[in-house]
From Swiss-Prot:
One biological process term in Gene Ontology: lipid A biosynthetic process
A molecular-function term among this protein's GO annotations: O-palmitoyltransferase activity
HAMAP family: PagP_transferase
Reported function: Transfers a fatty acid residue from the sn-1 position of a phospholipid to the N-linked hydroxyfatty acid chain on the proximal unit of lipid A or its precursors.
A matching Pfam family: PagP
Protein name: Lipid A acyltransferase PagP
InterPro entries attached to this UniProt entry: LipidA_acyl_PagP, OMP/PagP_b-brl
Catalyzed reaction equations: a lipid A + a 1,2-diacyl-sn-glycero-3-phosphocholine = a hepta-acyl lipid A + a 2-acyl-sn-glycero-3-phosphocholine; a lipid IVA + a 1,2-diacyl-sn-glycero-3-phosphocholine = a lipid IVB + a 2-acyl-sn-glycero-3-phosphocholine; a lipid IIA + a 1,2-diacyl-sn-glycero-3-phosphocholine = a lipid IIB + a 2-acyl-sn-glycero-3-phosphocholine
Key words of the record: Acyltransferase, Cell outer membrane, Membrane, Signal, Transferase
Native organism: Yersinia pestis
A GO-annotated cellular component: cell outer membrane
Secretion signal, residue range per the UniProt entry: 1-25
Its EC number(s): 2.3.1.251
Length: 199
């Protein structure tokens, strides 16, 4: 593991995150209270327009969060023991995001993260995340979420060519601490990874 690679990937991811398209920069921000923002009904416009609006509102939100990758688990039913032994399952790295909760308490975020992949190479990722949140009635401070991320990543073995990566998301939150995870599907000895981080 080369610390210079991690630092460079973090800087590169941060630069990508800080350069938003002009369409996002021109969107006025809305009233904010404790991570929640009121907005016009989400049913306005087509799917693409709603996505752009949600990305814009998350981008303009004053709320920030830190992402800390904690585990990369390779599905033992889909890998040879030899492959498992050769893989890194501690994805050292860091990430940064801007987030908001909408009027239905659903989570929206734009983020960038860089971490050490299964081969101990730096992997940057940036994207938009959405989760429909469920708040149990009697459990103050708890939230459970399920949703998706529409992201772009780049990997060493593909010469860091940007690759689209839509993935599912689930999380368990208590107050502002969240354990969030995704599953990367794949074939035998490839993919099938449960990636988990704290935010």
């Amino acid at each position: 593991m080369n610390y210079k690679d991690i630092i460079n990937a973090c800087i590169l991811s941060g630069v990508f995150l800080l350069h938003s398209p002009s369409a996002l920069a021109d969107t006025p921000s809305v009233g904010v209270s404790k991570g929640q923002e009121s907005l016009q009904p989400a049913a306005e416009g087509n799917l693409w327009q709603r996505l752009i609006r949600n990305v814009s509102l998350a981008w303009n939100s004053p709320h920030q969060e830190l992402y800390i990758p904690v585990n990369t688990w390779h599905n033992r039913w889909t890998y040879d023991d030899e492959k498992i032994a050769s893989y890194n399952e501690r994805p050292w790295g860091v990430g940064y995001g801007k987030y908001r909760y909408d009027e239905d308490n659903n989570w929206h975020s734009v983020y960038a993260m860089a971490f050490m992949d299964s081969h101990n190479r730096v992997e940057p990722i940036l994207g938009y995340g959405y989760q429909k949140m469920w708040i149990p009635g009697e459990r103050e401070g708890w939230r459970f979420g399920a949703g998706f991320t529409a992201s772009i990543t780049a990997r060493y073995e593909y010469h860091y060519i940007p690759l689209p990566l839509p993935l599912p998301l689930i999380s368990i939150e208590y107050n502002r601490l969240s354990l969030q995870t995704t599953y990367i599907p794949g074939t035998y000895n490839n993919g099938n990874v449960l990636f988990t981080w704290i935010r």
